[in-house]
C-alpha cells in the first residue's frame, strides 16, 4: 500500500515538473529563446506528413518516409534457387554422415 503511494507521488512530481517545462512562466525572461533560431525544422528530406486512417491503428497524423531508398541503395540480385540447392546437398551430406556414425556404432 505504501509503495503505491510512493509511485503515485513520484508520478505527480514528474508530471508537475514536465508540465512546468512545457508551459513556462511568461513573466520570466526568455534567455534561451533569443539564442535559438526563430524557425527550426526537424523533418528529414523525403518525409511527408500523412493523415492516418482509422483502421490502420494510427488514427492521427504520422510521418511516412517516401519510397526513395531503392534509388540510394540498390538491392543485390541473388539467385536463391542456387542457394536452396546447395542447402539441400549439405543436408543430405549431413544425413549420410549420421547414418555412417550409426552403422559404425552398431557394428
Swiss-Prot record:
Protein's recorded name: RxLR effector protein SFI1
GO cellular component: extracellular region; host cell nucleolus
Location of the protein in the cell: Secreted; Host nucleus, Host nucleolus
Family named by the database record: Belongs to the RxLR effector family.
Entry comment, domain topic: The RxLR-dEER motif acts to carry the protein into the host cell cytoplasm through binding to cell surface phosphatidylinositol-3-phosphate.
Classification lineage: Eukaryota, Sar, Stramenopiles, Oomycota, Peronosporales
Function of the protein: Effector that suppresses flg22-induced post-translational MAP kinase activation both tomato and Arabidopsis. The perception of highly conserved pathogen- or microbe-associated molecular patterns (PAMPs/MAMPs), such as flg22, triggers converging signaling pathways recruiting MAP kinase cascades and inducing transcriptional re-programming, yielding a generic antimicrobial response.
Signal peptide stretch: 1-22
Main location (coarse class): secreted
Keywords attached to this entry: Host nucleus, Secreted, Signal, Virulence
Domain of life, source organism: Eukaryota
Keyword Thylakoid attached: no
Motif range (RxLR-dEER): 40-58
Organism: Phytophthora infestans (strain T30-4) (Potato late blight agent)
